[in-house]
Amino acid sequence: MENPQIKVIVTGVTGMVGEGVMLEALRSPFVKEVLAISRKPSGHSHPKLKEYFLADFYQPEEIKEVVKDYDACLFCLGVSSVGMKEEEFRRKTYDLTLGFAAQMPKNISFSYI
C-alpha cells in the first residue's frame, strides 16, 4: 500500500524552530510538497520545496489562492516577549496568527508551533 502524502505550508523558516520543522517535513515520506511562506529566502534547496515571499504578514490576503490546495499549515512564526509591551506582543503573535489563519482553506489542519 502506498503512503498517503500531504502538502504542507511552513512559516518562520528563517528562524530556528521553523527551519527545523521545514527540514523534517522535507525528509518525511508522508509529505509530497512543502510551501515555505516567508519574507526572505530560506537558503535551502530541495525538490519538494517551494517558496512564496510575503512582504507583510499583517496583510496576508494575497496568499488565499496560493494555499488553497494544501492540507496542513505549521505556523512557526514568533518573537520573544522580552522587552516588549503586552499590546505589541499580542499584535505580533496572536493578531498576526489569526489574520494568517483566516486565509487558509476551511479544511486545512492549522498548528501554531
Indicate residue ranges for each PLM-predicted region:
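Glycine-centered tight turns that cap/initiate beta-strands
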Residues: 30-33, 48
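NAD(P)H-binding glycine-rich loop region in Rossmannoid oxidoreductase-like domains
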Residues: 8, 50-103
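Conserved Rossmann-fold NAD(P)-dependent oxidoreductase catalytic core, especially the SDR/UDP-sugar
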Residues: 35-40, 98-113
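Short, charged/polar "capping" segments at the starts of alpha-helices
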Residues: 41-45
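N-terminal Rossmann NAD(P)H-binding glycine-rich loop of SDR-like oxidoreductase domains
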Residues: 2-30
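Structural signature of the Rossmann-like NAD(P)-dependent dehydrogenase/reductase core
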Residues: 10, 75, 109-113
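Conserved acidic residues
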Residues: 32, 71, 108
